Amino acid sequence: MTRIVVTGAAGFIGSNIIQGLNARGLNDIIAIDDLTQGDKFRNLAHLKISDYVDASVFYDLFANGAYGQIEAVFHEGACSDTMESNGKYMMDNNYATSVNLFQACQKRGARLLYASSAATYGGSDTFREDPAFERPLNVYGYSKLLFDQRMRRECGNDFRRSVAGKTGQVVGFRYFNVYGPHEQHKGRMASVAFHQFHQFQAEGKVKLFADYGGYAAGAQMRDFIFIDDVVAVNLWFFDHPGVSGIFNLGTGRAQPFNDVASSVVNALRGLSGQTALGLEALTEAGLIEYIPFPDALRGKYQSYTQADLSALRATGCDHPFADVQTGVSNYVQWLAQQDS
């Protein structure tokens, strides 16, 4: 039987990966997390796992063989708060823990598929997996970049040592702006779609940043990716153990925040039997409102991201990605069902 470890198992991406594994009939899953934030258990309650282990004790036990033969580790556990300023906390959680896990995987012969981040690019305007374009704007992005750099050294810059079987499969996914079910515990770090859904329910309108960084109001652009697509690509690499490397995981399509807001509002209007409106009509009706760009984010904000998918596609992974209109509409319907 295939035994799999998922860290950050009660988190957003981790719980969705377990759901994807369960859909394949894979239930021998050891879930690793820290449930100090107890309400995260809801992300696990509907899933099939064989064990739960607290993150504080797992890594040493795993390295010493306590869990038998592990096929693969999906490493989603991290501090993902880009506004966290405690560098020691961030480096301990995102870098040192990841290094320890990599070393344990090497010792136990387990494959490692881990969460990196588009935050590694920071202020760059090119989003390709190349050190020339890696310019993190915060310690979160740096913590993710440092582990990517460590994997390049351990596996060879082109991961030839992994491909040759000397390290086993090692794959890093540079997640762009992920949204979808089971992110409710993330607070301020939950997706724009999540916050706008609840804002519209409470206030009857959604708010976007006004013009900033050379972009018109609401026209700042991000590569928004639906969680189902993130899971599908993770599982594609799980199915292809001979493929290693660091890969962007976005849609390859930048869309403005206006698209997200319009999709949220129109999806909610549709659920109440109202017709969809264009952006101009939504703003004229006061359903979308623009607010001044906050000083606290100046110099720390990515106004544009778009994943270069050349490396991902070169592996043979041809998974199609949902656009904002499709993904957000599906997500809003799911959120509405949870509220009903």
From Swiss-Prot:
UniProt GO BP: ADP-L-glycero-beta-D-manno-heptose biosynthetic process; carbohydrate metabolic process
E.C. numbers: 5.1.3.20
Cofactor(s) required, per the database record: NADP(+)
Metabolic or biological pathway: Nucleotide-sugar biosynthesis; ADP-L-glycero-beta-D-manno-heptose biosynthesis; ADP-L-glycero-beta-D-manno-heptose from D-glycero-beta-D-manno-heptose 7-phosphate: step 4/4
Pfam families tied to this protein: Epimerase (PF01370)
Cofactor note: Binds 1 NADP(+) per subunit.
Chain residues that bind substrate: N177, R188, H195, F209, A210, D211, Y212, R222, Y301
Matching Gene3D superfamilies: NAD(P)-binding Rossmann-like Domain, UDP-galactose 4-epimerase, domain 1
Record keywords, A-Z: Carbohydrate metabolism, Isomerase, NADP
Positions that bind NADP(+): F12, I13, D33, D34, K40, E76, G77, A78, C79, S80, N93, K144, V178, K186
InterPro entries: Epimerase_deHydtase, Heptose_epim, NAD(P)-bd_dom_sf
Stored NCBIfam families: heptose_epim
Family note: Belongs to the NAD(P)-dependent epimerase/dehydratase family. HldD subfamily.
Task of the protein: Catalyzes the interconversion between ADP-D-glycero-beta-D-manno-heptose and ADP-L-glycero-beta-D-manno-heptose via an epimerization at carbon 6 of the heptose.
Oligomer status and interactors: Homopentamer.
Entry-linked PANTHER family: ADP-L-GLYCERO-D-MANNO-HEPTOSE-6-EPIMERASE, NUCLEOSIDE-DIPHOSPHATE-SUGAR EPIMERASE
UniProt comment concerning the protein's domains: Contains a large N-terminal NADP-binding domain, and a smaller C-terminal substrate-binding domain.
The name this protein goes by in its record: ADP-L-glycero-D-manno-heptose-6-epimerase
Organism from which the protein derives: Albidiferax ferrireducens (strain ATCC BAA-621 / DSM 15236 / T118)
Recorded name of the encoding gene: hldD
